[in-house]
Curated annotation (Swiss-Prot):
The lineage of its organism: Eukaryota, Viridiplantae, Streptophyta, Embryophyta, Tracheophyta. It holds the Pfam family Fer2. Its cofactor is [2Fe-2S] cluster. PROSITE patterns: 2FE2S_FER_1, 2FE2S_FER_2. This is Ferredoxin.
Length: 97
């Protein structure tokens, strides 16, 4: 399946289609959208975003705790879309506070 991903970035919203077996960060880059990242392995918070609609599979994430996931935080480098999803990007500062 392929889903619509909407990213709310500091420069404004962008939308693209993302297959359910491609990480959102990778798909964003393939569509010409630069997002922050560091490790690309789900082990840091550089790529963190916050889901405002929809849901993802980020079972490869090793950084976020259950409470952060429940609040909607997502590591875009290890997140597969599981529905149409809207994510606010550039949320590392909110996460690490």
């Amino acid at each position: 399946a392929t889903y619509k991903v909407k990213l709310i970035t500091p420069e404004g919203p962008v939308e693209f289609n993302c297959p359910d077996d491609v990480y959102i960060l990778d798909s964003a880059e393939e569509n010409g959208h630069d997002l922050p990242y560091s490790c690309r392995a789900g082990a840091c918070s550089s790529c963190a975003g916050k889901i405002t609609a929809g849901n993802v599979d980020q079972s490869d994430n090793s950084f976020l705790d259950d409470d952060q996931v429940a609040e909607g935080f997502v590591l875009t480098c290890v997140a597969y879309p599981k529905s149409n999803v809207t994510i606010e990007t550039h949320k590392e500062d909110d996460l690490v506070g």
